[in-house]
C-alpha cells in the first residue's frame, strides 16, 4: 500500500491493513516512520501487471510528501497516464504548508519546497495527465478545494489560483497568509500516523467497556455529560412512553 504522506486530519488504516493482509507499506524515503516500510526514493518505481508506479518527492505540505505517477504500459512506457498528488496538489488549490511545520522546519521553508515541488516536478508532467488528489471539498488541508474528484495537469495549470505565474516569494507570501486555524488534533494525528500504535480493533476492545448505572451516576455527579448517539429511529424504538 502507498501513503503519499502522514495525514493530519485522520488516523490512517495502514497498520491495520498490514496486520490483516500482510500488505507492505510504501512511504517516501524521508518518512522516518517507526514501523517497517519500503522507502521510495525520487523516481523509484514499482511495477504490477501493466502498471508502473513511479514516486516523485514532492515535499511542501509535509516534509516527507510524495506523489505517485502512474504509467499504463499497455499504452505507453514513457508517457504518464495519471498522478496521485496526495495533499501537494488539489483540484483548485494546493496543500497548506503550516499544518506540519515543526522543530527544524517552518511554514515558510515548507512553502518554498511546495513551490519547487509544483513547478519543478508536477507541472513538468504532460497537460493531459489525470490528477487524483487525496482530498476534495471540506478538508482543512486547503482553503479552496473543488468538489470534483479528478482533473488534469493542464486544467490545473490554467484554472488553479496557486499555479498562476508568480515568483517563489509571491507564492510563499500568498500561501502562508490567511489560512484558517487548524484543529488541535491535527498534529496528534500526524504523529500517530508516523508511529506504531494499536489498531482500531485493539483500541475498541480496550476502550469500549460498559459502565454500570451506579458508575454513570457517579460520573454525572462529578460533571460528566451523557450524550445519546443513537439513531433517532433506534431511540424511538427503545423509548418508554408513559
Can you annotate each of these PLM segments?
Residues 75-83, 104-105, 109-203:
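Divalent-metal (often Zn2+) His-rich catalytic cores of metallo-beta-lactamase-fold enzymes
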Residues 240-242:
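Conserved small/polar residues in nucleotide/adenosyl-binding loops
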Residues 58, 224-230, 235:
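Short hydrophobic beta-strand that contains or immediately precedes a catalytic carboxylate
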Residues 37-128, 140-144:
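Catalytic core of the metallo-beta-lactamase
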Residues 6, 30-31, 62, 88, ...:
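Active-site metal-binding loops of divalent metal-dependent hydrolases
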Residues 205-219:
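A short, well-structured juxtamembrane/interface segment
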Residues 1-26:
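Active-site metal-binding motif and surrounding structural segment of the metallo-beta-lactamase
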Residues 5, 17, 58-61, 87, ...:
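Divalent metal-coordination and catalytic microenvironments
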